[in-house]
């Protein structure tokens, strides 16, 4: 018995096969081998052809089935993870009407800002937990105003994962978690946000049928089975956006738990047990994969643009030439906690939402030309990145979240002892590092949705925990002092 998981990203589509009994990934593949193209007709625009996702999914599926050597009839369920916030528009024949306006397209910002002001900030935050912002509903408002003939042909709107599920099953449906990320969900009414639809002039009929995140959401059609080399009738039993799915992949389901990534940009995704919001909209809040009205589980999402990109900049411009990241970490470790007074603000990769969309740039403070060297700068860069995470976590704590544990994949900045020890020391949280990824998580989510696993604890019982980092009490005061000095610069 095997589970097939797809991760539909903007750069590639990854497929993984998981043995349901052992919980182990037996094969993975991705397409394309270089980054998928993103079309930018104008500055700030970003579009992709949904048919490209399907083509890449077919190629990845063929590779993963060939590599595994298993029979197609042994695939028991399929799960989907996908890039969040993208808009896909289809007509009554399920034909795509225009390229998808994807997550990093900013053309809809003015529409969301206007809606936030005219509907009322308090109402939006209380009901949507967010500003309408640059999310899917605002993208659709742009289409309505700028492409009215095309808009009149829209039968249903979908997120990227909904589109892939439609291609697999022929059924058009979505989830509460998906609707919440598009700003289509009213948390007070526990229903579609009619007030936002009315404001933008959308008919409720464009919203697909709603299915539970963990449930049968359709079965593979004969045509899809032929295209993918699978068998007809395999159920699709899970779908979620990439950030809630990353949390699921790390077995983050309960209030106080955090899933984090620290690549070029960073993400802190914390689970809250109440439907609360940040009054300054510095973080976003969506329905987590296990959210229900009676047992709320919301995902509070913080993005930090200046994460690994700062570390790579330091490698190119400050570190000795030819040095590896591991060697750079060793050099940085020669500096003490707090980098002997040097502070770096890692905000050089665009506006930061947690700073209320201010674009403050990267800056270096406290350098003494007589006493500081490369090692102080390299350590201060990593500490500055961690301190930006801490600053965001404080916003979450202000929303009533009690942060106890941080789960992360053993990759990118989490490979650095300085980074992970600083994060544990300044937050007081235990850090657990795992070997997993989004497509494997989607496969295990499918196992939950199909009833193969009774719950998440059974599904992730074999999740490999590679390392546990506990805060060192003796160092916490030094981390706290360095953080407070850093925070004075914001």
Model-derived segments and spans:
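Extracytoplasmic ligand-binding clamshell segments of periplasmic binding protein
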Residues: 206, 212, 243
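Short beta-strand-loop/turn "lid" adjacent to the catalytic site in phosphate-handling enzymes
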Residues: 44, 66-103, 129-134, 161, ...
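Residue-level signal for inorganic ion chemistry
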Residues: 23, 49, 78, 105, ...
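Active-site core segments that coordinate phosphate-bearing ligands/cofactors
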Residues: 3-5, 17, 109, 116-130, ...
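N-terminal glycine/serine-rich phosphate-binding loop of ATP-dependent small-molecule kinases
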Residues: 1-98, 110, 114, 153, ...
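Signature tryptophan residues that serve as conserved aromatic anchors
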Residues: 45, 53-54, 103, 142, ...
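Surface-exposed, flexible loop/turn segments at secondary-structure boundaries
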Residues: 23, 33-36, 86, 95, ...
